[in-house]
């Protein structure tokens, strides 16, 4: 799609937004219902596209993308009317005989730039929030998941007028053309370097942005943890989508006292989940493309492999791999892995573990396995990270009742459920004041008696 076509799409959506059609709550709900029905109708196509792009099994496709997206859309449908109503606020004495309220209004013409690793979930969830809030939307899916992008375009073309929602496929040229346009809101999910570029381009028009980025999310296991449960949940979170998950445990920090037992249990769980030959397992996915495959494989140090390590370039598959005895200056610790490699480091004290994490860029997620509530609270309260779990991994994403987002280097802003609606809304504060009483204290000319009254009310 060329620059002129993109400019026309944005212009058409801006003209449509100015008709105020998206302000009607029933119209928003109807749009969400159409989206839900289109996703349901295309479930086989979605599953096939995910198998093509990422090798995902149908079970994983439904659990992590189709079903989760439908749940979020259903949540938005159920609550959009209540969220859209004005919210009454208390009035102080300065605004006596007034009604004070906040009114959520849509930003306008919005851009959603989606990633390739969960191409439906990470497109449909922000889309549902944007529609619930009353915006028009241009979606730019990733060129690295072409089969999924094509199905997304088909879903949106069937469900929406292009003046409301349009999908723009393509690569870097289309990204550049889109970022040259003036948007009222940009929602980006992807890498930290690209997120910085998006924010820089958005700043030229002072466009607000939500950035869902990534980072090296730590998983801490102390000596009190239920190791069997920890092993199963770590294996699930790490090797789901073959590690291509923004909140996957990136590395393991384990107390030296339980190191050997925990690694033995994780190895057992990997074999139980994927078999003795995971590269032959049809339900075990593949790396998205050859470039990413080469990068991830290059992070494997053969001298530190204690599980897996084998890669098959023809199918873009890499075994679930554990690296033990990893040092902080190893290559695998210098970047987000985004693949099926789990580096293992040890600590002697909680102070050592906390310092190791806080000396690095703020991660998107953190996971602490411990039966000690004081330890749990220490990491939850005092270590900066976007969100996380106690005695589990990645499940803080699987709800519409809490927001999800990063901080610092892992992003800004939140979405899911109410937070999605708020992310795509501007809150207007309105004072509606009666005219039957007009207190004179604030008006010039000022006098000492007026000043006394003002001090009674404002102090």
Model-derived segments and their meaning:
Residues 149-152, 178, 198, 262, ...:
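Hydrophobic packing residues within well-ordered alpha-helices of enzyme cores
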Residues 28, 73, 134, 165, ...:
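Residue-level signal for inorganic ion chemistry
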Residues 17, 21, 36-39, 43, ...:
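Structural signal for hydrophobic packing residues in well-ordered secondary-structure cores
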């Amino acid at each position: 799609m060329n620059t002129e076509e993109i400019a026309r799409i944005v212009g058409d959506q801006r003209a449509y937004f100015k008709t105020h059609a998206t302000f009607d709550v029933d119209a928003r709900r109807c749009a969400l219902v159409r989206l839900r029905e289109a996703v349901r109708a295309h479930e086989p196509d979605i599953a096939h596209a995910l198998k093509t792009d990422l090798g995902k099994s149908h079970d994983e496709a439904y659990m992590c993308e189709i079903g989760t997206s439908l749940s979020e859309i259903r949540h938005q449908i159920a609550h959009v009317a209540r969220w859209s109503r004005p919210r009454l606020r208390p009035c102080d004495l300065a605004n006596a005989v007034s009604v004070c309220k906040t009114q959520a209004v849509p930003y306008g013409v919005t851009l959603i730039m989606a990633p390739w690793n969960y191409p439906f979930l990470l497109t449909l969830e922000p889309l549902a929030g944007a529609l619930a809030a009353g915006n028009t939307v241009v979606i730019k899916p990733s060129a690295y998941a072409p089969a999924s992008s094509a199905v997304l375009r088909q879903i949106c073309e069937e469900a929406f007028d292009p003046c409301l929602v349009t999908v723009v496929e393509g690569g870097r040229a289309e990204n550049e053309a889109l970022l040259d346009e003036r948007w009222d809101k940009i929602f980006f999910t992807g890498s930290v370097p690209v997120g910085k570029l998006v924010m820089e381009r958005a700043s030229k028009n002072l466009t607000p942005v939500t950035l869902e980025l990534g980072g090296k999310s730590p998983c801490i296991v102390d000596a009190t943890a239920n190791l069997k449960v920890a092993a199963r949940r770590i294996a699930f979170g790490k090797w789901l989508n073959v590690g291509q998950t923004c909140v996957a445990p990136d590395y393991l920090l384990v107390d030296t006292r339980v190191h050997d037992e925990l690694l033995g249990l994780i190895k057992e769980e990997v074999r139980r989940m994927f078999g003795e030959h995971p590269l032959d397992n049809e339900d075990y996915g593949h790396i998205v493309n050859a470039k990413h495959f080469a990068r991830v494989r290059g992070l494997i140090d053969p001298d530190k492999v204690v599980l897996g390590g084998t890669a098959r370039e023809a199918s873009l598959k890499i075994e679930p791999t554990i690296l033990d005895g990893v040092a902080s200056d190893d290559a695998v610790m210098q970047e987000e892995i985004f693949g099926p490699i789990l580096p293992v480091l040890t600590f002697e004290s909680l102070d050592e573990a906390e310092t190791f994490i806080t000396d690095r860029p703020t991660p998107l997620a953190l996971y602490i396995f411990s039966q000690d509530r004081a330890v749990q609270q220490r990491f939850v309260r005092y270590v900066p990270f976007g969100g996380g779990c106690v005695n589990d991994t990645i499940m803080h994403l699987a709800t519409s009742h809490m927001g999800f987002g990063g901080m610092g280097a892992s992003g800004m802003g939140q979405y899911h459920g109410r937070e999605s609606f708020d992310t795509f809304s501007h809150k207007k504060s309105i004072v509606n004041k009666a005219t039957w009483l007009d207190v004179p204290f604030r008006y010039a000319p000022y006098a000492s008696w007026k000043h006394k009254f003002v001090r009674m009310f404002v102090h």
